């Protein structure tokens, strides 16, 4: 039996994962299916593609094949088997045939009897930030493709599930629903469904781990004199004390008002941003002028002179 490069047959690389191999197989199986293709050698190519896939989809057989593929040009390979009997280099084709010829067909037959596991399915689920704070039940609707033995989609099966989203889930977290993926073939087990959580952007809060950040606008006099100002949280509103002399960028910690996690609850950080009022009228301008005269020693750009030596 002549050596066959199964990776080249499927058009994949030796480093590609099972998902890439499966995708290539289905594409080529549809291309060369005798009922679809008009090419003269379609049936032969179809069988070759199926043979390659049967070997590469199985981890153990793929490892054996990779070893043979790596050493196929080594004149010393195969001279000594695990049972101690010697082989000539010319026996390489016999080794390949024994492992991937009749043996392979026997493996295929056993695998067909055992059935093939269904595909795993992934889908994204968008939730609002507030919904992460308590367990939620969501109705999930999706469709599952059903493939025939030749890798072609026969039908789409619509499914509806009521799924519990646990409290404390984070963006990008995967929730596994066992057996809710694609159906198996020939009695094989169904695949799993993986829900990927996507938290919708919030108009007020930014997520930093289990903590939240909110930009807190304050008036110049609030920053200068200190004040108590209302600050929204995910559940309610609190009064936060602004210390006198606060600056833009200063962070004030509000303990326990962040995200509810599975092991801990984060904090909320209010980031101060001093906001100037609109263009002052005559009275306001006079007051600002008085302030400027009272604070003549204050130079907001003094650090520039230090940096310039």
UniProtKB/Swiss-Prot annotation:
Regions annotated as coiled coil: none
Any Pfam family hit: DnaJ_C
Every J domain range: 5-69
GO MF terms held by the record: bent DNA binding; unfolded protein binding
InterPro entries per record: DNA-bd_curved-DNA, DnaJ_C, DnaJ_domain, DnaJ_domain_CS, HSP40/DnaJ_pept-bd, J_dom_sf
Principal location: cytoplasm
Annotated S-S bridges: none
A Gene Ontology term for the protein's cellular component: nucleoid
Keyword Lipid metabolism: no
Top-rank lineage group of the source organism: Bacteria
GO biological process: chaperone cofactor-dependent protein refolding; protein refolding
Entry keyword set: Chaperone, Cytoplasm, DNA-binding
Compartments, as annotated in UniProt: Cytoplasm, Nucleoid
ATP-binding as UniProt keyword: no
Record SUPFAM superfamilies: Chaperone J-domain (SSF46565), HSP40/DnaJ peptide-binding domain (SSF49493)
Cross-referenced NCBIfam families: PRK10266.1
Function: DNA-binding protein that preferentially recognizes a curved DNA sequence. It is probably a functional analog of DnaJ; displays overlapping activities with DnaJ, but functions under different conditions, probably acting as a molecular chaperone in an adaptive response to environmental stresses other than heat shock. Lacks autonomous chaperone activity; binds native substrates and targets them for recognition by DnaK. Its activity is inhibited by the binding of CbpM.
UniProt-listed PANTHER family: DNAJ HOMOLOG 1, MITOCHONDRIAL-RELATED
Protein name: Curved DNA-binding protein
The species this protein was found in: Serratia proteamaculans (strain 568)
Lineage, broadest ranks: Bacteria, Pseudomonadati, Pseudomonadota, Gammaproteobacteria, Enterobacterales
């Amino acid at each position: 039996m002549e050596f066959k490069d199964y990776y080249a047959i499927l058009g994949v690389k030796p480093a590609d994962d099972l998902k890439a191999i499966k995708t290539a197989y289905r594409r080529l199986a549809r291309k060369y299916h005798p009922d679809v293709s008009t090419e003269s050698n379609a049936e032969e190519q179809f069988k070759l593609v199926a043979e390659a896939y049967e070997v590469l989809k199985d981890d153990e057989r793929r490892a054996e094949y990779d070893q043979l593929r790596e050493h196929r040009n080594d004149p010393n390979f195969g001279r000594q088997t695990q049972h101690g009997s010697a082989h000539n280099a010319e026996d390489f084709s016999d080794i390949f045939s024994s492992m991937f010829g009749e043996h392979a067909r026997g493996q295929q037959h056993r695998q067909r009897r055992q059935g093939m596991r269904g595909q795993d399915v992934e889908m994204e689920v968008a939730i609002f930030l507030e919904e992460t704070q308590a367990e939620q039940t969501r109705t999930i609707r999706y469709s599952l493709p059903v493939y025939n033995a030749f890798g072609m989609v026969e039908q789409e099966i619509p499914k509806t599930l009521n799924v519990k989203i646990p409290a404390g889930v984070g963006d990008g977290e995967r929730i596994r629903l066992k057996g809710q993926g694609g159906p198996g073939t020939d009695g094989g087990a169904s695949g799993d469904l993986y829900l990927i959580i996507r938290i919708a952007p919030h108009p007020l809060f930014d997520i930093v781990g289990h903590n939240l950040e909110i930009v807190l606008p304050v008036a110049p006099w609030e920053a200068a004199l200190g004040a108590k100002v209302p600050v929204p949280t995910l559940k309610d509103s609190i009064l936060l004390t602004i210390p006198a002399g606060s600056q833009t960028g200063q962070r004030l910690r509000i303990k326990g008002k962040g995200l509810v996690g599975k092991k801990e609850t984060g904090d909320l950080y209010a980031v101060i941003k001093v906001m100037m009022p609109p263009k002052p009228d005559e009275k306001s301008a006079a007051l600002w002028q008085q302030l400027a005269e009272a604070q003549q020693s204050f130079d907001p750009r003094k650090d520039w002179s230090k940096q310039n030596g």
